[in-house]
């Protein structure tokens, strides 16, 4: 299945929450999409449907396709620790996500474009792979020739997010992936254990 590129508000309404961040359109219409959205009731779902919905929410939130997401789950399952928590930590360590968390881009979708269009470096080297896995201590910066881009400047000016596991120097337009975030430091409203149960069926 191809990556979804349609209206983010429609997907947010499907899950009943603003999974892509602040969304004024969602706030106005926070009911299911479709002609009869207002009349639809979020009725009782089966266990499988609930687990599947949670997996879809995570994939949409991070902008990850099924093959990549399953690969991350396998890596998490093979690691020591709580599988669901490690899965989210792997998602958070992706370059596109960190670019978003640092405020270089207003959304993860925009962050993927910024990375793909060669506007970001990691430890001084140009990296254009959104799924690139960062390690603690890695330095992420806006490429010198891209520092004057209006879209990046506007995003940084509007960013108010502060995370303990990353640092950002506005003057140098450079930040550091200090550490892998603990589960409590990840703000996403995702019930990762449901995803683990789904994949373990």
Swiss-Prot record:
It comes from the Bacteria. This is Small ribosomal subunit protein uS4. Part of the 30S ribosomal subunit. Contacts protein S5. The interaction surface between S4 and S5 is involved in control of translational fidelity. One of its GO terms (cellular component) is small ribosomal subunit. One of its GO terms (molecular function) is rRNA binding. One of the primary rRNA binding proteins, it binds directly to 16S rRNA where it nucleates assembly of the body of the 30S subunit. The keyword Membrane does not apply. GO terms for biological process: ribosomal small subunit biogenesis; translation. Keywords: Ribonucleoprotein, Ribosomal protein, RNA-binding, rRNA-binding. Belongs to the universal ribosomal protein uS4 family. Pfam families: Ribosomal_S4 (PF00163), S4 (PF01479). Residues 93-153 form the S4 RNA-binding domain. It comes from Flavobacterium psychrophilum (strain ATCC 49511 / DSM 21280 / CIP 103535 / JIP02/86).
């Amino acid at each position: 299945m191809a990556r979804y590129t349609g209206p983010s508000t429609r997907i947010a309404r499907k899950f009943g929450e603003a999974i892509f961040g602040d969304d004024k359109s969602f706030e106005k219409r926070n009911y299911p999409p479709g002609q009869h959205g207002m009349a639809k009731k979020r009725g009782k779902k089966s266990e499988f449907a609930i687990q599947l919905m949670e997996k879809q929410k995570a994939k949409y939130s991070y902008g990850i396709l099924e093959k990549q997401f399953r690969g991350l789950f396998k890596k998490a399952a093979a690691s020591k620790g709580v599988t669901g928590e490690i899965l989210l930590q792997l998602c958070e360590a992706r370059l596109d996500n960190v670019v978003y968390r640092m405020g270089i881009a207003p959304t993860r979708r925009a962050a993927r474009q910024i990375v793909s269009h060669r506007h970001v470096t990691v430890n001084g080297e140009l990296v254009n792979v959104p799924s690139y896995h960062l390690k603690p201590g890695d330095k992420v910066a806006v490429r010198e020739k891209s520092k004057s881009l209006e879209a990046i400047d506007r995003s940084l000016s509007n960013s108010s997010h502060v995370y303990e596991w990353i640092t950002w120097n506005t003057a140098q337009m450079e930040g550091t992936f200090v550490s892998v975030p603990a589960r409590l430091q990840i703000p996403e409203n995702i019930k990762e254990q449901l995803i683990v149960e789904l994949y373990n069926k």
